[in-house]
Amino acid sequence: MISSLHRPTVARVDLEAIQANIDKIQRHIPKKVKTYAVVKANAYGHGAVAVSKAVEDQVDGYCVSNLDEALELRQAGIDKEILILGVILASELQLAIKHQLTITVASLEWLELAKKESVDFSQLHVHVKVDSGMGRIGVRSLAEANQLISILSDMGVQLDGIFTHFATADESDHAMFDKQLTFFKQLVEQLDKRPALVHASNSATSLWHSETIFNAIRLGIVIYGLNPSGNSLSLPCPLKEALSLESRLVHVKQIQAGDSVGYGASYVAAESEYVGTLPIGYADGWTRNMQGFKVLVEGEFCDIIGRVSMDQLTIRLLQAYPIGTKVTLIGQQGKQVITATDVADYRGTINYEVLCLLSDRIPREY
């Protein structure tokens, strides 16, 4: 998708805020551990390459979701460790070795496929994934973990780490978290051969369960300044939201009582009012169900009226503002603030999704 560079809609990313957030979280951790910056999904919509370069001196490596995301970083000159959290195709092992990428091994079945590949396994770096209760990928028993590690050792693979992922670390009820933690700790303690690196701490675990950290952490949503729990749990240290979303009025008109706006004529004016049009829509990740949400114009809240279209949306203005007036959809304007969590709450989703949905049509400015 081509960025719309000639359209007045932009996502501004404060890289210094991301750096400051990492510093605060690292100081919150009770011991020195290895730090991975999670930059999957285009760094949660913030721009993977720009973010990775900005935090290079603060982290030991990066986590991505897939091989393509890892290759993007390598092609941009990022040479620190990159851990691919998802499972890659066994047929792509040579690419992983060529670019010195660390892969995740999650099952014996996959390993049997990998053994058929003609590659130099002594150059392959892996972390073993344990499914302690998340239910997606990973070995699910001590016997399976020991068998997998034994085969990897026989193959001459560089076994660097073992890890798991918590399903409820951002919730006030700790029952499931404690169950997963106990399972993982017992499994690691009983391994016939324990890898040097052990990690289970995502953003939420690093914030609210820092006493459970092993010797590495994976920092994702928190480095971008967002609370993993939404507003359910209080942050133990203040963070700054790094991304703001702005557009500008491209059309302003006055409508009369009875006039309708948008697809389905879902909004009908009750009286004479001013309406402004913004060049942003659901193709940009500003979803169709945002009718009724408020944006900021000259520091005042204005309602989105009518259904959000593919490329445009309309707002009810307090007065006839001139074309080119800035409109803030996420961020601060004057004394008022709209957060990604506010958007998420309105949509009935999570702040992660709000940022990840922002499409490549929206240019990022740093």
UniProtKB/Swiss-Prot annotation:
EC top class, in one word? Answer: isomerase
Q: Could you say which EC number(s) this protein's record lists?
A: 5.1.1.1
Q: Which CDD domains match?
A: PLPDE_III_AR
Say yes or no: keyword Isomerase present. Answer: yes
Q: In which pathway does it act?
A: Amino-acid biosynthesis; D-alanine biosynthesis; D-alanine from L-alanine: step 1/1
Family matches, as SUPFAM superfamilies: Alanine racemase C-terminal domain-like, PLP-binding barrel
- Entry's Pfam families? Ala_racemase_C, Ala_racemase_N
Give this protein's Gene Ontology molecular function annotations.
alanine racemase activity; pyridoxal phosphate binding
What PROSITE patterns does the database record attribute to this sequence?
ALANINE_RACEMASE
- Residues with the N6-(pyridoxal phosphate)lysine modification: 40
Q: Which GO terms describe its biological process?
A: D-alanine biosynthetic process; peptidoglycan biosynthetic process
Keyword set, alphabetical order: Isomerase, Pyridoxal phosphate
* InterPro entries per record: Ala_racemase, Ala_racemase/Decarboxylase_C, Ala_racemase_C, Ala_racemase_N, Ala_racemase_pyridoxalP-BS, PLP-binding_barrel
Which segment of the chain is annotated as a signal peptide? none
Q: Name its co-factor(s).
A: pyridoxal 5'-phosphate
Q: Which reaction does it catalyse?
A: L-alanine = D-alanine
Binding positions for substrate per the UniProt entry = 136, 310
Which residues act catalytically here? 40, 263
Q: Which Gene3D superfamilies match?
A: Alanine racemase, Lyase, Ornithine Decarboxylase, Chain A, domain 1
Question: What is a single cellular component term in the Gene Ontology annotation?
Answer: cytosol
Task: State the protein's purpose.
Answer: Catalyzes the interconversion of L-alanine and D-alanine. May also act on other amino acids.
Q: Which family does it belong to?
A: Belongs to the alanine racemase family.
Q: What is this protein called?
A: Alanine racemase
Source organism per UniProt: Streptococcus equi subsp. zooepidemicus (strain MGCS10565)
* The gene coding this protein: alr
